[in-house]
């Protein structure tokens, strides 16, 4: 809310500016290489070799997206090809779109994208992921499914124009959605011994507590899906309350 259309780097700059006003906050623009238990605390080591000690650790490192290895896809990702219909579907409404998906989520993703465009082409990039019943449902909606392998996405200045298949066939498209593989952006949750859920997220309670005392997780690292900024921010707020509550209880012992 209040930040519709803002670029991620602009949002990040605003957040840093607001946080910097608090004297108790020290922001370090460094990469952490390891986190380990040290008696009743944790030792955090950075890429530069600096060592920090902390009573608690909040993992909010998010996810990394692994895109299908299709030539040109990275050139259009985040510009005219996106992963989240709820984030960018409105901006692509009524255009001829492609849905690139190689897994069991394909049918669901197509149904969601249908809310914004009825001119859809489904590309499974050489994978057979749809049942006959699902194919028939899509056919009745006028949605074509192409299982041939994609070799390239072509366009100009980030705007997708056409798809190229291994058969040399081409299809015109003006945008679309892709289902990337989502992985933890950092290994710290697993390295610290946190329980992971079936989606690869860190298991937490309602206040961000993991199964390891003193370790908390928030945002996409614990939720995995839906991966949205406003949800991640809310999870961060709840985890912060959990950290504060537990530190307060310890201080009164």
PLM regions: where:
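FAD-binding core/adjacent interface of flavoenzyme oxidoreductases
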Residues: 26-95, 202-206, 210
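Cofactor-binding loop segments of dinucleotide-utilizing enzymes, especially the Rossmann-like FAD-
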Residues: 86, 102, 125-127, 220
